Amino acid sequence: MDLKDFIENFAAEFDETPAEAFAPETEFKTLDEWNSLTALSIIAMVDDSYNKTITGANLRACTTIEDLFNFVASL
């Protein structure tokens, strides 16, 4: 699992946010496009791309994309 690829997969779940807005330190819940549907898309992306299951509570516990990456990598 690679952080760069994870960020690309994460960014692909957003339609209107430019790719350059996504970095390891991005606080994803502050993005204008972030909402409950996007959260579900991220949960599905983690399941589909990495064969790992996360919950909404797991997602809420993360602040940055790197936090989420580290959590998923630890599973």
Label the model's feature ranges:
Residues M1-W34, T38-I43, D48-L75:
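Phosphopantetheine-dependent thiolation modules in NRPS/PKS and related acyl-activating systems
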